[in-house]
């Protein structure tokens, strides 16, 4: 099983821009076009393509943001955007990619926690995150989404 997390570059940008979620998921996450624009405006964001067996199957965006965190004085590590392309959903890739992303972020940032935010009606995603140990911490982000945190 080959999983790779690759930065968005000129070589894969067009393919990344072609990724999309299903129609019923559009209200939960921004398009890759919007994500890449956000990353251009905010240097904390690191957009990446998610590859399985050489195929681009998803997208994520993460970063170390300069908010106070009791265990990391440099800030909080956020998994800000994450999705599997509609064409690859229902094949267990969400679990595989989330596991790889958690490991990647833990190694990259040497962090003790990973944060994310989610709309409370995104039940499928909440269940996935809970299976991987993410729990609601009582906070809301600036968009009113509920914050979840995973202790590493």
Swiss-Prot record:
Pathway field of the UniProt record reads:
Amine and polyamine degradation; spermine degradation; Amine and polyamine degradation; spermidine degradation
- Asked whether the UniProt record includes Cytoplasm among its keywords, one would answer no
Q: Which UniProt keywords apply?
A: Acyltransferase, Transferase
Recorded protein name is: Spermine/spermidine N(1)-acetyltransferase
Reactions this protein catalyses: an alkane-alpha,omega-diamine + acetyl-CoA = an N-acetylalkane-alpha,omega-diamine + CoA + H(+); spermine + acetyl-CoA = N(1)-acetylspermine + CoA + H(+); spermidine + acetyl-CoA = N(1)-acetylspermidine + CoA + H(+)
State the superkingdom.
Answer: Bacteria
Q: Which Gene3D superfamilies match?
A: 3.40.630.30, The crystal structure of the spermine/spermidine acetyltransferase from enterococcus faecali
What Enzyme Commission number(s) does the record list for this chain?
2.3.1.57
Species name: Bacillus subtilis (strain 168)
Q: List, from the UniProt record, the residues annotated as the active site of this protein.
A: 129 (proton donor)
